[in-house]
Every structure is written in structure tokens, then in C-alpha cells.
Amino acid sequence: MMVGTQNLGGSLPPLNSPKSYGITKPLSLAGPSSADIKRNVELEKYLVDEGLYESKDDTMRREEVLGRIDQIVKHWVKQLTQQRGYTDQMVEDANAVIFTFGSYRLGVHGPGADIDTLCVGPSYVNREEDFFIILHDILAEMEEVTELHPVPDAHVPVMKFKFQGIPIDLLYASISLLVVPQDLDISSSSVLCEVDEPTVRSLNGCRVADQILKLVPNFEHFRTTLRCLKYWAKKRGVYSNVTGFLGGVNWALLVARVCQLYPNAIPSMLVSRFFRVYTQWRWPNPVMLCAIEEDELGFPVWDRRKNHRDRYHLMPIITPAYPCMNSSYNVSQSTLRVMTEQFQFGNNILQEIELNKQHWSSLFEQYMFFEAYKNYLQVDIVAADAEDLLAWKGWVESRFRQLTLKIERDTNGMLMCHPQPNEYVDTARQFLHCAFFMGLQRAEGVGGQECQQFDIRGTVDEFRQEVNMYMFWKPGMDVFVSHVRRRQLPPFVFPNGYRRPRQSRHQNLPGGKSGEDGSVSHSGSVVERHAKRKNDSEMMDVRPEKPEKRASLSPQSLDIVSPENSAITTGWTPPVCNLRRPPSEEIEADNLNTECTELTDLARNECNSGSEQVLEVDSMAVVQECSDPAEPLGKCVTPDSVDVVACVSGQEENLDRNLRSVSISGTDSPLLPSRSCGQNRDYEGFGFPAANSDPMGKKNLYSQSGMSEDLQSNSLVSGMEKSEDRARSESFQKSQIRLLT
């Protein structure tokens, strides 16, 4: 499907349209200006040039594949009906129906995208045996089917495969009917009668997609805007539900809400309003397209007033179909911070675009993840063969989010983790391998004791133990977690196998930097006062008495933490680079006009401007924070060369390195207690304080719009249009590193 500009004129609804969308009145009924239309043409041309639309031939191939899958499941159900002794009439009437959902159903899929598909079958055809065993075997024997991978234990059980090269995610729902009609109305609540919760989740993918299209004023404008923002999210590294960011349905719901608030806006306007709204949204107030409805069927719906677990959701985005659920329960404190920064980045770029100071390409600039941090966790995944690696990687990736949550939990939210959704493969290695990475940074604006240490050896052990409990584990499957310094990152994570010349990190920060004249510098521009940047000054101190790798052990829990010294530690890892964090940051709320008060109070993050961080490693990593930059350092020690053990495919490889170190303290510091291994807790059980999980308090515990209750009126219209967002100013502090034995 291609896009053009022919719909800009006649497709807009009338300005005084009587139909209302959403749970609040629109923020603006304004239509596009001539400048908006011009920018919209440029945006759509950019999306086409970027190859985001598939050809007509590819569209026809997808339709043919869906027709073929429909034939297969119909034959499968008839075969089972006959084998189970039903009458000839029942065999003749036996039926299964295929529905699509996700990006394909919403019309925003691109070339090579998978097709989210749901098979609805009769009550006597079950998921556990009939779908995941019998249908699986039928598909496995077909030449058209490749990379068949069942995931029966997923939150939404799914069978993944490629059919004639097109990726398919096939779900199954057995409803309480002996015969499934071909014209089944899946949006009716009656399909949910007498089904289990996995079936409800499977059915709701289609039900949510249909509801979204019904709840937006103009679905063509919605589709273009969503296609644009999904592409932006992938470029900025925040498109992944499994790692704690947002997936396709989350982005669709966020875009749909903006379409409701600006019903007459075209895509170029909606993209701008998207960033304007969500940089000012008061999380954890929920985003909802319609009111949450109860039903006599009795399924639990999202309601933080009644459900204790719902109060710990940080970024609730509620699905519009019964039973209404939070589609973004995976979001953690760390990933919410990253997404908030990226929203600010997008908002600043859009302000520049509207002033004709930037082009659309600036919005979609790739986020340089491997230049953003000094510390990274590397998670290496290995398996015996390609099929095992596919299954093992999917399992480890699904648990990767838990590592983020556990680190937040065990450091009381003082260490933030930025998981990178993309996987990386070292093609130079002969064994089957892939790797994921996570950036590490001390949380901004958190209080803490001087030189505090955080022990996460037990955290890493706990993560590895949970991962190794994989139900379908096979010999050869293994996972390794290690710290790497930025300049020790493996070459295969960089384009063409080599890192590009170092640039000022201000070019990669979301939101750019504010100069003295008030102008904002984005990627591609350099703030003069930060133009000169020192090279990495971190040094390392290695003592040679323990050259070999050893398994990490969880430290004993301590009830008292020293006010002078404490740290962060991970187990059996190579040396880790120093962590850097921005100093004090303050985002002021935008002042609206006199007709209304603030749209929202933006969070103020206060932190020590002179903080300095150090990592210490003894087959472990230790992050140390000192608030006084003038604190005297210990003397520099230059040891002899020593063997540092690196993990390669489960084997040890000795690497001779000459390392130096600057020590911050002459004595070992007590460690913050770590959680013992073997605990398997949900995010809701991590014990975050209510102040962190629900900072808005009772007053805003359940606000329908996410905005201040006194602002839910038409007086917001002019205020939103006149708001001026300010970019946050960040700088980076020096940090040191040392190795302990």
C-alpha cells in the first residue's frame, strides 16, 4: 500500500463533527495550515523513500499465504472431527476461522514484517495437544514451512514459523461452540464465554485492533502517524515489548489517543502533538481510548483502586476491548526513563522542524547506544545448533527484562539499566552465538550515602539460575553475563566491524542541549562549551594472584551499610568501565496561557552535580559513587601484566593485558545486601515503595486523561498549542575504575 497526498483535502471530518472520540473533549479542533500540509507531503515522501511500504506484489503474496493457512486449519479441524467419531454432518460443518491482528490488521506493516494471525476453532479442539502437537506436526511436514518454533509457555501461547518466506505468528483460541460460523463476530463478548485466560489474551489481539480502528477519527491519518512513530521507535531503540519498552499495540494505543485529542489534524501535526502530549504526561496515570467496562463474565479488568498489583504499573496503556488490560506491564523504572528522554528528544526535533530548522531525517537519526554509556552488561547466548539457538535465544530474551527489574530491586532503584532490544552476532565465530547488551548508569536525582556500593553478584546468579530452568533445555545451551567497558566492546556490534571516531555525547543525547542563547543543539551540532572533551581517563588495577575465572557467589546479607563506603558488584565478569551520569537535571513545566493552568507538572530530577563513580572488579563489578569531587584519591598503582579471563563459548581464554588503576579508597567497603539466589518473584513483588510506584498519590490515583483533573476542559485547547518545551541540559562527570582481588 502506497500513500499520497490525495486524501488531504476530502478525508478530513467536518470541524463541527458531532461525533466525539475518547473519554475527554479534544484539545484542539484545528485543521491543517498550508505549512502543515507541506510538511505532511515531505513526511509521507520520506516514509516512502525509506522503504516502509511494501509493493503490491508482496501484498498479494501475503493474501495468498493467509488463504493457504486458512485451508490448512480447516482441513486440520475436519480431520480431528472425523477421528473423534463425530457424525458425517458434523465433519462437514466442522470449521476454523483465521483472523489477523497487530500491524497487518491495522494496515501499518512493512516489507518483511510478520503477520499476527489467530485461528479460532471449536470447543473440542484444544491448544495443548491438537494445536501444539498435531497441527505442529502437519506444518513441520510441509515444504513451504520453515523455522517452525512453538512457544506454548508464553504469556500468549504462539507458534512461530515462516510460510513461503513470510513470517507468521499463529495463535489458537478454542471457543465454546461445536461449530464455528464463518462470519463469527469476534468483537462480541459472547466469544469469551467459558474460555480460559490464555484464550482471552489470544482473542483480545483481534478485538483490540478492531476497537482501535473504531475509536480513531480518521484511520488513514492514524495509520500514517503510527507507521512514522513505529519507525522512529525502532531507530531510537525503544521498540520492544519483551525487553521492557513498548511493542506494536502499545504504540498504536498511544497514537490513537493523540488522534482523539486532535481529531482534525493530519499526520505531520499528529506526530508533533504526540511528542508534545507524552513529554507532559503524568505517568502513571493511564492512557485510555474509552472507559473501562465491567461485564458479567467476571474477568479481571485493570483497576489500580481495586487491584494491588495494578498500582505498581509505571506506564499503564489500557486496551479498549473487554477485559481491559494494561498492555505495557513490562515497563520498568529504567525503560520508562529511557522512553521519557526519547520523547523529549522527539519533541525538541519537532519544534525545530516546525521552525524549518531541521528536516524529517533528523527525527529518525539512529540512537548511538554504544556511545551513550561507559558501562555495559553483555549477555552471551550459545547453543549446539541453529534450531536450539532459536528456541534458547527466545527464552533468554523473554527473561532479559527480569534482569533489569532485579538490578533495580537489589539496588533500591539507584542503578538504572538501559537494555538494547537488538541482538548482535559475531559472524567470525564458528559456534552458534548471539549477544544482547545493557547500558548501566546511576539513577539521576536519587539520594544516597557517600561512596555507596551495590552488590549485584547475587542478582546475576539469580538471573542465570532462572534462565537455566528452561523447560526445553538441551546440552550446549548456555548463557554468560559479563561487564564490558565501552572501549572493550566487541567489533561485531559496530557497523562494518569497527567503531567510528568518538564524538561528543551531546550529539546523541535525547533532547539536545540548551546553549546560552536559548537555542537547542541536536544531533549533528555541538555545544561550544562541551566541544573539547577528554578521552577516556579510566585506568585499571589488577592484582595477579587470581588470574582464572571463578563462579560468582552471592554475598552474605548485611543489615547495616556503612555511610562512607558501599558499592555495586556483579559476579565472574571481565573488567568493567566506569559509569557516568548526567549531573543535575531540571525540566520545568510549560506555562500555559491565562485561560488555564499547567497541563502537567514535569518531574524535577535533583542530583549532585559533583558526583563521581568508580567500578571495582574482582571477578565482579563494583560501582561506587562519591559526592565530593574534591575528595583525595589514593595513589596510582601500576601492576605487572596479568591474565584476565574472558568467556568464549563456555571456555576460558587468557588475554594478556597491561592495566593501570587509580584507587578511590584504600580500604574495602561494606556492600549493600544482595538478595539471595533462587528467588523467583514477579515485578509486583519486588517491594518498590508506594511513593516510587504511584508518585501521584491518591489525588491522581485514577485520572482518566493522565492530565490534572482541573484541566479536563476545553480551556486546554489554546494552552496546549502555546506550550514551549525546554530541553534538558546534561553534562558528564569524570569517573575512575579499579580492579580488586
UniProtKB/Swiss-Prot annotation:
It is found in: Nucleus. Disruption phenotype: Lethal. Belongs to the poly(A) polymerase family. It comes from Arabidopsis thaliana (Mouse-ear cress). Monomer. Forms a complex with cleavage and polyadenylation specificity factor (CPSF) subunits CFIS2, FIPS3, PAPS1, PABN1, PABN2, PABN3 and FIPS5. It is an enzyme of class 2 (transferase). Essential protein. Polymerase that creates the 3'-poly(A) tail of mRNA's. Also required for the endoribonucleolytic cleavage reaction at some polyadenylation sites. May acquire specificity through interaction with a cleavage and polyadenylation specificity factor (CPSF) at its C-terminus. One of its GO terms (cellular component) is nucleus. Residues 494-556, 683-741 are annotated as: Disordered. SUPFAM superfamilies: Nucleotidyltransferase, PAP/Archaeal CCA-adding enzyme, C-terminal domain, PAP/OAS1 substrate-binding domain. Keywords: ATP-binding, Magnesium, Metal-binding, mRNA processing, Nucleotide-binding, Nucleotidyltransferase, Nucleus, Transferase. GO terms for biological process: mRNA processing; RNA 3'-end processing. It catalyses: RNA(n) + ATP = RNA(n)-3'-adenine ribonucleotide + diphosphate. Residues 701-717, 732-741 have a biased composition (Polar residues). A motif (Nuclear localization signal) lies at residues 485-492. Its main location: nucleus. This is Nuclear poly(A) polymerase 4. Its EC number is 2.7.7.19. Pfam families: PAP_central, PAP_NTPase, PAP_RNA-bind. Its cofactor is Mg(2+); Mn(2+). Residues 534-551, 721-731 have a biased composition (Basic and acidic residues). It comes from the Eukaryota. The gene is PAPS4. Mg(2+) 2 binds at D114, D116, D169. ATP binds at F101, G102, S103, A113, D114, I115, D116, D169, K230, Y239, G248, V249.
